[in-house]
Amino acid sequence: MITLPEQLEKLSKQENLIAQGAESLVYSAQHPYLPQQECIVKYRPKKPYRLPELDAQLSKHRTLAEARVLQKLALGDVEVPHLVFIDAKNGLIYMEKIEGLSVKQWIWNEEGDTEGGAQEAGDKSRSLPDGDVSSLKDTLVLVGQEIGKLHKSDIVHGDLTTSNVMLRDGKPVIIDFGLASVSTLAEDKAVDLYVMERAVLSTHPVHSQQYCDWLFEGYLAVVGKSQKEVMRKLEDVRQRGRKRSMLG
Amino acid sequence: MTTYLSLGLEGSANKLGVGVIKHTVTDANAENGFSTDILSNIRDTYITPPGEGFLPRDTARHHRNWVVRIIKRALDEAKISDPTKLHCISFTQGPGMGAPLQSVVIAARTIAQMWGVPLVGVNHCVGHIEMGRTITGATNPVVLYVSGGNTQVIAYSKQRYRIFGETLDIAVGNCLDRFARVLKIPNAPSPGYNIEQLAKKGKKYVPLPYTVKGMDLSMSGVLQFVESLAKRFQAGDLVVDGHQVTAEDLCFSLQETLFAMLVEITERAMAHVNSQQVLIVGGVGCNERLQEMMGIMARDRNGSVYATDERFCIDNGIMIAHAGLLAWRQGFETKMEKTQCTQRFRTDEVLVDWRV
């Protein structure tokens, strides 16, 4: 087998780059043990804008946390990529490749907004295309259920957006656990939901309320008895957001 | 070719600003079919003694005392002898501190009636964004708006400035100001500026909490932690890794931590909306270390960063005049009975119909 830094050098060619996230580069790669199987490598490069001490600490912590969470979830019923291999020192994680679109892109396609919501202006009053409503609803309810299962496993994602849920054969798979952590606290789960709500509002502004309703419908269907406390906290977090004094 | 003139009044926090702007329209059908001239931009800041913040009542009194003189100076400098020739009076309708906003809107209503000129209420945040776009020439950037009361990551979509990320509790400028109060760092010209100067001499990095939640962030925990360190420093027993920590080290560590968080959420928003440009606005935006860090991040994404200097970053009247005039040219006017100010006025409430 080739050593990892060498491997990375071979990988890090532009043609292998699948995505440039906020803090990681995702390359398609060969599985380290099963050469016929395709997988991806998530690499956290050094961030020269921040202090080396802080950067090293964050990269190591997040790579480890992501791997731990993926490993924990591998035994449960939440759909996440399989963890293949980790090299925390070099900030590398090998994992299963999920084929499909992100929910963000899929919704934009469904809405007929191919160039991307945040970059394009459109008419404000457009209604949802009739034929697509049921597939949008079904999918978002499923996404909500997946998030519910995640919280039921006491995992908080930390960055729930429609970019971080993929659709594989129409079934949602949650990805990118770089900011994830283990928590049983209703407060942490509520902040997770608040982040999701805000991301939907900004990314899919025209029908955000409807989309959130569907997500929560799915979420509430699976979380069970812990839901009361989480939803109550969510109300608190929303208030905090709204009340924030806005001077300046 | 048509020209339009607007006078803007800003007083949502401790700066009182009045500015006059001129738009010369060459192509009325194009979004960018006009040029902008800044005829005057006058500001007076209410400065409190070290260790104290500015209270609404005292700030409002400062604005009342100065507003007439500042308006006169702005008109003189703009060489406007007949103010009835102005096309609109723009004023900050919110968000901000209640009492200071109130005292300035009274001035706005008065001159509008004296001169028979329509009023236009402006959202403070939109004022910052529009001024930043105009000065830097950034066309469709992700905007990081950082000031004493606001911390937001914004991108334009479908006629609104959408908030992608923001603070879940206190603003970054508030965090810096309150830290400055503990160490009695002077408030002139601004606490943030003095922290920036001290931070340049800091060497030892003291680890602080790092709390990013997706595109949002939280800073109250960082503040509490660094305040407790500052108090230990004042008591003379702050040693980390065998190193005697100085006030400079604390300023340095606080800046590095907060700004790393800000750059990270901005980068996350850029990745999320596929944008290559960043624009930094708001008072904290004139911090050169923040601009430098943002520049490194943008460069690594093959993008670019746009920032302005203190004339436009720090609250000013010209940005209000500018955003007000953009709205007025679309036929927007705030009727006298609708000119109440509001402390809470979300950036995404404004219909941005001057952009496509």
Curated annotation (Swiss-Prot), chain A:
Pfam families found in the cross-reference section: APH (PF01636)
Sites where the protein binds ATP: 18-26, 42
Domain Protein kinase, first and last residues per copy: 12-248
SUPFAM superfamilies: Protein kinase-like (PK-like)
Catalytic activity field: L-seryl-[protein] + ATP = O-phospho-L-seryl-[protein] + ADP + H(+); L-threonyl-[protein] + ATP = O-phospho-L-threonyl-[protein] + ADP + H(+)
Enzyme Commission identifier(s): 3.6.-.-, 2.7.11.1
Record GO terms (molecular function): ATP binding; ATP hydrolysis activity; protein serine kinase activity; protein serine/threonine kinase activity
ATP-binding as UniProt keyword: yes
GO biological process: positive regulation of transcription by RNA polymerase II; telomere maintenance via recombination; tRNA processing; tRNA threonylcarbamoyladenosine metabolic process
PANTHER family in the cross-refs: EKC_KEOPS COMPLEX SUBUNIT TP53RK, NON-SPECIFIC SERINE/THREONINE PROTEIN KINASE
The protein's assembly and partners: Component of the EKC/KEOPS complex composed of at least BUD32, CGI121, GON7, KAE1 and PCC1; the whole complex dimerizes.
Family: Belongs to the protein kinase superfamily. BUD32 family.
Record remark: domains: This protein is considered an atypical serine/threonine kinase, because it lacks the conventional structural elements necessary for the substrate recognition as well as a lysine residue that in all other serine/threonine kinases participates in the catalytic event. BUD32 has protein kinase activity in vitro, but in the context of the EKC/KEOPS complex, the catalytic subunit KAE1 switches the activity of BUD32 from kinase into ATPase.
Protein name: EKC/KEOPS complex subunit BUD32
UniProt lineage: Eukaryota, Fungi, Dikarya, Ascomycota, Saccharomycotina
From Swiss-Prot, chain B:
Co-factor remark: Binds 1 divalent metal cation per subunit.
CDD domains: ASKHA_NBD_OSGEP_like_euk
Superkingdom of this protein's organism: Eukaryota
Record: residues binding substrate: 145-149, 177, 192, 196, 287
GO cellular component: chromatin; cytoplasm; EKC/KEOPS complex; nucleus
Cofactor: a divalent metal cation
Catalytic activity: L-threonylcarbamoyladenylate + adenosine(37) in tRNA = N(6)-L-threonylcarbamoyladenosine(37) in tRNA + AMP + H(+)
Protein's UniProt keywords contain DNA-binding: no
InterPro entries: ATPase_NBD, Gcp-like_dom, KAE1/TsaD, Kae1_archaea_euk, Peptidase_M22_CS
PROSITE patterns: GLYCOPROTEASE
Enzyme Commission number: 2.3.1.234
GO biological-process terms attached to the record: positive regulation of transcription by RNA polymerase II; telomere maintenance via recombination; tRNA threonylcarbamoyladenosine modification
Binding site for a divalent metal cation: 124, 128, 145, 315
Pfam family, one: TsaD
Entry keyword set: Activator, Acyltransferase, Cytoplasm, Metal-binding, Nucleus, Transcription, Transcription regulation, Transferase, tRNA processing
GO molecular function terms attached to this record: chromatin DNA binding; metal ion binding; N(6)-L-threonylcarbamoyladenine synthase activity; nucleotidase activity
Places the protein is found: Cytoplasm; Nucleus
Family, per entry: Belongs to the KAE1 / TsaD family.
Task of the protein: Component of the EKC/KEOPS complex that is required for the formation of a threonylcarbamoyl group on adenosine at position 37 (t(6)A37) in tRNAs that read codons beginning with adenine. The complex is probably involved in the transfer of the threonylcarbamoyl moiety of threonylcarbamoyl-AMP (TC-AMP) to the N6 group of A37. KAE1 likely plays a direct catalytic role in this reaction, but requires other protein(s) of the complex to fulfill this activity. The EKC/KEOPS complex also promotes both telomere uncapping and telomere elongation.
HAMAP family in UniProt: Kae1
Oligomeric form and interacting partners: Component of the EKC/KEOPS complex composed of at least BUD32, CGI121, GON7, KAE1 and PCC1; the whole complex dimerizes.
Designated name of the protein: tRNA N6-adenosine threonylcarbamoyltransferase
